[in-house]
Amino acid sequence: MKKRILVTGGTGYIGSHTVVELQQSGYDVVIVDNLSNSNADVVDNIEKVTGIRPAFEKLDCLDYEGMDKLFTKYAGIEGIIHFAASKAVGESCQKPLLYYRNNLVSLINLLELMPKHNVKGIIFSSSCTVYGQPDTLPVTEAAPIKKAESPYGNTKQINEEIIRDTVASGSPVHAIMLRYFNPIGAHPSALIGELPNGVPQNLLPYVTQTAMGIREQLSVFGDDYDTP
């Protein structure tokens, strides 16, 4: 019997690529996404790439009762990969409370529901922003955690502490935290990639959307940094 994995934010950029890799590695995947920054068509494209249609539920991880019912519906989930989060640094400075609610409560709900439904493991999508302004480059896991420079970065720092405290309390939950830098690119099939809803909050979607003709031009601000 295939092992079942829940991927939150599974129609997003990193999430969709992870779902493809999981399915191609023989896992049974359940996707949860509220589609706030992605499109349900991604599920169709995942099926085109892998030949397997993952289970998909349009659901917000903030909805505790909804998530509780999901774990019951898809009994036997063995692990969670938690990507679902608000992720734009600039926007987090404008809407800090939105980021604290979305990014903290969603994780807390999962950590509370995991023991109830006998889910043992979680991989948490953290961020390189937890390092603040590092003393040296390149940054390694041994680098000290510095003061976060945005509410987004602070939510990732706090979430890591929540996970550490939960595990240290004797909870049966096992956790891994992955601190990503800036992923770019798309699947070789070009069926999945980074195509956020609305105005992109980071550079690469602007570049690709301009190349595709979705946007008329790409603005470059400043003239004091030589481009190699």
Model-derived features with residue positions:
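Catalytic helix-loop patch of NAD(P)-dependent Rossmann-fold dehydrogenases
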Residues: 94-97, 101, 105-112, 116, ...
